Structure formats: structure tokens, C-alpha cells
Amino acid sequence: LFRNSVEPEVLIFFRQTMAQNLTIRLARSTDYDQILKLSEGIYDGHDYLPPRYHTWMAMENLHVMLAFSGNKLASLVACSIIDEGKTVVTRAGRTSPEFCGQGIFKLLQQAIVDFSLKRYPIIQQWRLVTVFSPEMLDNSYENVDEQDSLTCMVLSSTKRPPSFSFNLDSLEIQPCTKEYVCDVIFQKEEEKLFPGKVIQADRFPIEPSLSNINYLMQENDSLHFAVEKCVHDGCRPRSFSLGVRSQYVKFVNWCVTIYSDDPQLYQAHLVHQFKRSCEEIESEFSFVCCHDKKFTKNGIEVLQEFLSLKSDEDIKLRKAYVYEQ
């Protein structure tokens, strides 16, 4: 079991690790300037940690841990306690280039997991998102979800194409409430839409539940839920999308995750979420679409059309794997 995989000798919270002259402790609000310096240049401005840091400091069930070498900040990792306290998710990990390759991040990650197990004794599993495919990890990690993501920049409202050419009137997508999502989508359609029982919200892996949606609302600007319009009583939704709007270092970011097995419904959700993001955000922004890999080619074609791109080189493809231990 995950609990039994924790080695007692790695419990180093709040004490020096003499072998590497490290000090590991929880972050404070006053560490912000050092964290900004550690985060300089990460993800080319697509980094969410600095804008969220003070919000995170005020949130329950969220902790940031730091590793110092002397008085230099060497590494950082955060964790969220979600799924009604059953899961710890590690996030926002980073290490200074000066200290890369020394095993510091692995030590820090183990420290924050150990801290979480002691503080939240009902934790049953550790979950993380990474770009590493299953063959790159050992057998102790269970691959529970994987998605492709497409990222592109959208110009400010005054420079955008005047209209959209896709005609998908027969597949109308409509917004829905948090209550509908939690009472209908999560309760009645979970097995069909989320076979791994995990959804990725801006690449943050959570179980589909009301408590986790409320958690998301604490740290993001807004959430936009959408389903296809039902045409008769008793109609059951075959698709769902979640758009997350948040502030990154250089840009506002809109990340949509689409769940459906139908290519037309996938495209309809992408159109709907893209239009909604353009309505809400007037400045230049980053648009990210996450989905099953079978829809990647279709997604690239749609975004090329929207943004009048002559090449798909301006659309960045990335894979994300969710593991549990």
C-alpha cells in the first residue's frame, strides 16, 4: 500500500539533512520574493504559481514546502489534500538550475508526502501529473489517466478574426451550473465519461465531486461548465467540458478539458469554450485544450481555422500522464 511505501528515515520535516546541508520547511508569505526568483523563466510565462502563491498561503488543505541549501532556495513543491481528504496531489514542483541533478527535489517531494500523511491520517494515495510515460517510471506507479493538450496564443480582441466558420448548430452546447454538474454529470454519468474516476482541471487531477469543484473555485478566477443541449425529456448527456480561467505570470490562461467519445461533440465543445474564452478575455491570452489523444488532429485543425494559422507550429502539443501510488 501507499502508506507502507513511506520510509521512516525520510521524515525530515523541519530539520537539517546533514548529508546535503539542506533545510526543509513549510513556506511562509514572506518567502514570496525568493520564490519569484526561483521561478524566473519557468514555462516561458505560462507559470501559475507566482500569481496564486498568496491565495495558496490562505487556503486550507494546501501546503508549500521549500528546500534551502544554506540560505539559498534550492527547490519547491506544493501539495493539495483533496477527494474528501483521501488523496495528496503534489504540484508546482521546481528546482533551481544550480541544484539540478542532486536528488534534492526527490527528497523534498518525499518530505511533503510524509508531512501530509502525518497531518492527514486518512490519506490513502498520492497522485501526480507528469510528462513521463509509464515505461519511464517503476511499477509502483499506476497510470490512471492520460491526455494530450494543445496550447496556443490568442490575440487581443481588436486583432482577432471577425467570425468563426464552423457550423455546428445541430450540436448545440450550453452552459450548465455547478449543481447540475455535481448532481447529474458526476453522479449519473461518471462511469461513462470518466472511466478512470479522475478529471483534469487545468491539469490538476481530481475525483469528480462537489468538494473538489469548490476547491477549484478557491484558487481560480472562474470555471465554465458545458454539456450538449438535450432535445427530449430523459436525455442523458454524452459529453462534458470544463473551462478554467486563471492568471499566469504573463497571460490570462483558459484551459478546457473535454470528455466525450464523439468527434462532433468534441469539436462542438471546443468551439463553445473557445468562443466563451474570447467573450470573457479582451487581452491576449493563452488557450489550452486537453482531451483524449484520438482528438488531437481534429483539435489542431479547429484551432488553425480559428486563429488563421498557416502552420501548426504555433500550436504546442504536450502529453500529461496521471499516476497514483
State what each model feature region is.
Residues T17-P51, E146-C152, K159-L210:
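Short amphipathic alpha-helix that is part of the acyltransferase structural core
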Residues K86-P97, Y248-D262:
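Conserved acetyl-CoA binding element of GNAT-fold acetyltransferases
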